[in-house]
Each structure stands twice: as structure tokens, then as C-alpha cells.
UniProtKB/Swiss-Prot annotation:
GO terms classed as biological process: translation
Protein name: Large ribosomal subunit protein uL11
Highest taxon listed in the record's lineage: Bacteria
The species this protein was found in: Lactobacillus johnsonii (strain CNCM I-12250 / La1 / NCC 533)
Assigned keywords, A-Z: Methylation, Ribonucleoprotein, Ribosomal protein, RNA-binding, rRNA-binding
Subunit structure of this chain's protein: Part of the ribosomal stalk of the 50S ribosomal subunit. Interacts with L10 and the large rRNA to form the base of the stalk. L10 forms an elongated spine to which L12 dimers bind in a sequential fashion forming a multimeric L10(L12)X complex.
GO cellular component: cytosolic large ribosomal subunit
SUPFAM superfamilies: Ribosomal L11/L12e N-terminal domain, Ribosomal protein L11, C-terminal domain
Annotated function: Forms part of the ribosomal stalk which helps the ribosome interact with GTP-bound translation factors.
Record PTM text: One or more lysine residues are methylated.
GO molecular function: large ribosomal subunit rRNA binding; structural constituent of ribosome
InterPro entries: Ribosomal_uL11 (IPR000911), Ribosomal_uL11_bac-typ (IPR006519), Ribosomal_uL11_C (IPR020783), Ribosomal_uL11_C_sf (IPR036769), Ribosomal_uL11_CS (IPR020785), Ribosomal_uL11_N (IPR020784), Ribosomal_uL11_N_sf (IPR036796)
Length: 141
């Protein structure tokens, strides 16, 4: 018989840098998760992605055990890294802050493909281009 799920917690945590301090500790404590166990597992699993924000979905079961799935970094984080900027534009329609190439967009789309709801790489690229435009980035050929 399958374990009964009592809670699902979604967080975005810097890779390899999960600590019991807020915001991670309180969110996990409320769910009844062993915080130290989670932070050790998460940091070990994401040690190779230092500097990235990693979305994680934690499933908590009735017996207080848990399992978690790490996802790919958000498209906005990957775009900012590719364009070498700290943040997007506050007014994306009027102020463009950076440029990204189609090759960079394709690379990001390939990275994100398993988490995107896209049938093929072209559809994924269109999604990433839309995110780039909404951040005030110009997509060039």
C-alpha cells in the first residue's frame, strides 16, 4: 500500500546552500520534516549547480518521511546568467537592458525542456523568448 501524502512544499533554494535558517527552516518545520536531513540531502544533490536557484518540490508522508524532486533553474535566472545582468528591466516595453542570442535561448530551452510543457525544442524556445522579452531583453539572431 502506498504511503499517504499529507503535505507538498514547494521552495526555491540556492543550490548547495540550504540552511535551517529562514525561509527554509520554518517552511519545513511547519510541514514536520527533519530539517537537517533535508538540508544535507539537498546540498549534496545540488553541489554541482552552485550559484543557481533550484526549485524543489518536497512531498511529506503521514509517517513524517519525505522525498523531494529538484527541477531546473527558472528561465529568468538562466537568462540573467546568459546576458550577464543582475536583474531585468522594470519597464520591459520601453527600456531594454540586455541582449541574448538565439543560440543562448536554444541552450536554455534544451536545459529547461524536461520541466516545460512544450512538444518540441522550437516551442520551448518561443517560451524562453517570451520570458526574455518580458524581462526587457532583446532576442537577436
Amino acid at each position: 500500500m502506498a504511503k499517504k501524502v499529507i503535505n507538498v512544499v514547494k521552495l526555491q533554494i540556492p543550490a548547495g546552500a540550504a540552511t535551517p535558517a529562514p525561509p527554509v527552516g520554518p517552511a519545513l518545520g511547519q510541514a514536520g520534516i527533519n530539517i537537517v536531513g533535508f538540508t544535507k540531502d539537498f546540498n549534496a544533490r545540488t553541489a554541482d549547480q552552485k550559484g543557481m536557484i533550484i526549485p524543489v518540490v518536497i512531498t511529506v508522508y503521514e509517517d513524517r518521511s519525505f522525498e523531494f524532486i529538484t527541477k531546473t533553474p527558472p528561465a529568468a535566472v538562466l537568462l540573467k546568467k546568459a546576458a550577464k545582468v543582475d536583474k531585468g528591466s522594470g519597464e520591459p516595453n520601453t527600456k531594454k537592458v540586455a541582449k541574448v542570442t538565439k543560440d543562448q535561448v536554444k541552450e536554455i530551452a534544451e536545459t529547461k525542456m524536461k520541466d516545460l510543457n512544450a512538444a518540441d525544442i522550437e516551442a520551448a524556445m518561443r517560451m524562453i523568448e517570451g520570458t526574455a522579452r518580458s524581462m526587457g531583453f532583446t532576442v537577436e539572431d
